[in-house]
Amino acid sequence: MEETGRNGEEMERTLVWGHRGASGYAPENTMAAFEKAVELGADGIELDVQLTKDGELVVIHDETIDRVSDGSGWVKDYAYAKLIKHNFNRTHPEYEHAQIPTLEEVYALIKPTDLTINVEIKTGVVFYPEIEERVLDLTERMGLMERVIFFLL
């Protein structure tokens, strides 16, 4: 996509990315934030992936749920069924209830759009065996390999 710059020459358009979704408008890394990024016309979204005790790929930046939810503790110590009982609206309390999404749920939302997805795989603080393979397998299974940028931290 090209636009005209100040000097009248054509230039590439700056791309707009939703960091943790549209986290300025909705609780970060929640479906509401990703839906808002789509609604606002973002070119792409950035999200973070951690792994639950029962092996679910969940979208959350921190290794603990303390900062963004009404709960506390390490993501790795929660089964997904227990994790979704917490309210992840701490950064935007005006949202009555925001659940932590799975990576598959976010992929399903983004798949019908033309957005690019930057997936940050979290392995710096907590070592998750095989998380990279699990993310790659899901991405391939959902037909999104051409639209995903992977970043390991």
What residue ranges belong to the model's regions?
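Phosphate-group recognition and catalysis centered on beta-loop-alpha active-site segments
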Residues: 1-153
